[in-house]
Amino acid sequence: MQSQGQNNIYTVVKNYIPKNVMATKNRAKTWLYGYNEKYDLIIISKDGTLGEVYEISNVKIGLPKHPDKFENDDKKKENQVWESKELPKVLKRIQTIFQWHEAPPNFKSQWVDYIESEFDKREQGHWFKNNGVPTYITGTHYMYLQWTKIDVGHPDFREANRIFYLFWEACKADKRSFGMCYLKIRRSGFSFMSSCEGVNQATITRDARIGILSKTGADAKKMFTDKVVPISNNYPFFFKPIQDGMDKPKTELAYRVPASKITKKNMYDIGSEELDGLDTTIDWKNTSDNSYDGEKLQYLLHDESGKWERPENILNNWRV
């Protein structure tokens, strides 16, 4: 963990919110996700609480208040690190939500708390102790670390990536934002991180389209087939909608039947919502100034955008 200083990628802003205001609103859990104009603060907490305020690239970002207990409290300080957990073997045998509905009631009762907890972490983020320090990761970061397989297996926890995801969550929370431009070093994991976010968004969003562009059409296709599709296929059944077509599509990944949230209240039900299509797709296009012209996108991944080959120009495409 870095010590604070002018070369850090973030700083913790002390006493940014008056203590009496912080205490009152935390008790009532009335801090709202999004931009808070009064305090010029982007709140990424989704549980109504506010804890530390980070400043990242001159943007004030409010994290949730840390809990009193952590999953790895039972470990010695020097052994407290991020650890991904394998899906329980019995749940690996279930491939679709339909197989879950056919499972015996006692089996569902045994595993519903685990599944509910995973949905909560995906939505609200996750706390753990890192060498004794309470550490918050966003839900998107959790999905990357826990449920994404990359070329070397599970991703490592990196503090720089944590800050990236905090800033990205602020971009999503702030309705004034058009997105994020990220300049990176090699092997930083961005292609996998952005692919993970594309799949994460697609599997929870209805009637949306997610696009991929890269420096060439061949690179965009490779990102789709080698990263996006495997990430989707490796999701556990409770996060994975039913998709149209092949398991390994080459041009479009189409989600139809959604993976609705499993809770104690609905774990025995087969409601009509499971049969309504998501109608969300992920696809890629050849690199061109007018790629995706006139098409509404929920999320556009521009990979290697600084390497477009002439005569194509990323600036022209951005104006489309």
Label the model's feature ranges.
Residues Q2-V320:
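Phosphate/NTP-binding elements of NTP-utilizing enzymes
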